[in-house]
Swiss-Prot record:
The chain crosses the membrane at residues 24-44. This is Protein adenylyltransferase FICD. GO terms for cellular component: endoplasmic reticulum; endoplasmic reticulum membrane. Pfam families: Fic. The modification O-AMP-serine is found at residue 79. GO terms for biological process: protein adenylylation; protein deadenylylation; regulation of IRE1-mediated unfolded protein response; response to endoplasmic reticulum stress; response to unfolded protein. Protein that can both mediate the addition of adenosine 5'-monophosphate (AMP) to specific residues of target proteins (AMPylation), and the removal of the same modification from target proteins (de-AMPylation), depending on the context. Acts as a key regulator of the ERN1/IRE1-mediated unfolded protein response (UPR) by mediating AMPylation or de-AMPylation of HSPA5/BiP. It is found in: Endoplasmic reticulum membrane. The gene is Ficd. It is a single-pass type II membrane protein. Residues 45-458 are lumenal. Its main location: endoplasmic reticulum. The active site is at residue 363. The modification O-AMP-threonine is found at residues 80, 183.
């Protein structure tokens, strides 16, 4: 593009009336013009080199950030430690960025909310708090004030979640730090008490005779329901009856997607592999075990990608998983954690939930990550004496929301969600064998008077 004017200058026809002096003057002017153009082009070349250097620098920085697993912003409790990379904190900042007009409206709404609260009009105040956060999701003062408001309503878990979210955005916010120091011990107490309730129910389930026909029937139904819900979460449209037909008869359902039916067969194969090979196995869970699970999950749908790590970058909602070249390294680190003493000392539900989250965070496969993560979670639960649990398709929105909250820095809502699913499974088994359901301990309401709710999206 730059050379085109030069070509046109050279191609100008010389007038016939030009004298020798005129020819000399013409050549002098042409030399000056070429010299000026070269003087202009040389800096442009330098600028181009600088641009390329900057791009190379960005590429190098991106690579370093992808590998910077130890440069972290931690948002943890002593019982549940999860590190979030600085890159992910940046993604959160981008996500919560509001327009200048939105920020002004958020501040006005917060001031009105505080005034309504002062006047005792708590219903209006709550709506205004939520409106402020809708206008500016990263408004730390609004998060902190809504946390105080929730704490006054004795919704300690919600308050602690809001303080934690504020600190994820602004780690040195003084008021949020003070408030979270107050709520954290209370929340840990609530969580541990809930785990104790689950342990009590597990002991009741384990006391049911293995030959119980009622238990056998409900476990069989649970098996079909688990496959139905875990593929439905991913968008599979087969009904429970159709899934039962496929697995019992080995015949395809006419008029239905063969790919969806192969997803069901793959889940069935993966669950058989876990039940027959891994549950009773003594020893570490390895990368090969996870690859074998995935090979069965995806093997009937995409045999080329089944059982192998992805080779392309993917985007999952607001989350950017690790670069493909870092997947194997992160899976090795994940496996080390999976078999570490720290992980083994966690409560089984907490351990299983964290394993699920960490695997889906890495997103090591091109497809089938959610199904594989849920299977790994159930493997850990079964090895600890818990029954496999089911996340129902009706819970899909809540499930994805708490995963997103975990990506933002607080994994505890996801752990509580898995704990709630675990309790539903245990209650189902106990109620199906009614003689063992007497005097079940209740997790809610708890004796402290605190509400035990999952955080809601403002």
């Amino acid at each position: 593009m730059i050379l085109m004017p030069m070509a046109s200058v050279v191609a100008v026809a010389e007038p016939k009336w030009v004298s020798v002096w005129g020819r000399f003057l013409w050549m002098t002017l042409l030399s000056m013009a070429l010299g000026s153009l070269l003087a202009l082009l040389l800096p442009l070349g330098a600028v181009e080199e600088q641009c390329l250097a900057v791009l190379r620098g960005f590429h190098l920085l991106r690579s370093k950030l992808d590998r910077a697993q130890h440069v972290v912003t931690k948002c943890t409790s002593p019982s549940t430690e999860l590190s979030v990379t600085s890159r992910d904190a940046g993604l959160l900042t981008v996500k919560t960025k509001a327009s200048p007009a939105g920020k002004l409206e958020a501040k006005a709404a917060l001031n009105q909310a505080l005034e309504m609260k002062r006047q005792g009009k708590r219903g209006k105040a709550h709506k205004l708090f939520l409106h402020a956060l809708k206008m500016d999701p990263g408004f730390v003062d609004a998060l902190n004030e809504l946390g105080i408001f929730s704490e006054e309503d004795k919704d300690i878990i919600q308050a602690d979640y809001l303080y934690t979210r504020a600190l994820t955005i602004s780690p040195f916010h003084e008021k949020a730090l003070i408030n979270r120091d107050r709520t954290l011990p209370l929340v840990e107490e609530i969580d541990q008490r809930y785990f104790s309730v689950l342990d009590s129910k597990v002991r009741k389930v384990m006391s049911i005779p293995k030959g119980s026909s009622a238990l056998r029937r409900v476990m069989e139904e649970t098996y079909y329901h688990h496959i139905y819900h875990t593929v439905a979460i991913e968008g599979n449209t087969l009904t429970l009856a159709e899934i039962r037909h496929i697995l019992e008869t080995r015949y395809a359902v006419p008029g239905k997607s063969l790919e969806e039916q192969n997803e069901v067969i793959g889940m069935h194969a993966a669950m058989k592999y876990i039940n027959s090979t891994l549950v009773s196995r003594i020893g570490s869970v390895t990368i090969d075990h996870m690859l074998e699970i995935h090979r069965r999950v995806l093997g009937y749908v995409d045999p080329v990608e089944a059982g192998r790590f992805r080779r392309t970058q993917v985007l999952v909602g607001h989350h950017i998983p690790p670069h493909p070249r870092d997947v194997e390294k992160q899976m090795q680190e994940f496996t080390q954690w999976l078999n570490s003493e720290d992980a083994m000392n966690l409560h089984p539900v907490e351990f299983a939930a964290l394993a699920h989250y960490k695997l889906v965070y890495i997103h090591p496969f091109i497809d089938g990550n959610g199904r594989t993560s849920r299977l790994l979670m159930n493997l850990i639960l079964m090895q600890a004496g818990y029954p496999p649990i089911t996340i129902r398709k009706e819970q899909r929105s809540e499930y994805y929301h708490v995963l997103e909250v975990a990506n933002e820095g607080d994994v505890r809502p996801f752990i509580r969600f898995i704990a709630k699913c675990t309790e539903v499974t245990l209650d189902t088994l106990l109620l199906a064998t009614t003689e063992y359901s007497a005097a079940l301990p209740e997790a809610q309401p708890n004796h402290s008077g605190f509400k035990e709710t999952l955080p809601v999206r403002p």
